[in-house]
A protein has these predicted regions:
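Short, flexible loop motifs at catalytic/binding sites
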Residues: 1-74
Length: 74
């Protein structure tokens, strides 16, 4: 999780803002994540990174599509 947050922190912040209600991350130094939504979100972002989709300008749309389909579980 630390690696994912460090590598994609801006995308992580974007993801946190997208949640309802929004999550308020304290920063990349947070080591223990217990909120299931955070774990699922980071897992989804990592999944997109592993598949190279984060390099695409429409990665947010792909992420939302993944979320709609149930996401990639943490």
């Amino acid at each position: 999780v630390k690696f994912i947050v460090a590598q994609n922190y801006q995308r992580y912040l974007w993801w946190c803002r997208e949640q309802n209600p929004p999550l308020n991350p304290r920063g990349p130094e947070v080591r223990y994540v217990t909120d299931a939504r955070v774990l699922r979100g980071l897992s989804n972002i990592n999944y997109l990174c592993l598949n190279g989709w984060m390099d695409r300008p429409d990665w947010r749309d792909i992420y939302h599509e993944l979320l709609i389909r149930g996401g990639r579980q943490a």
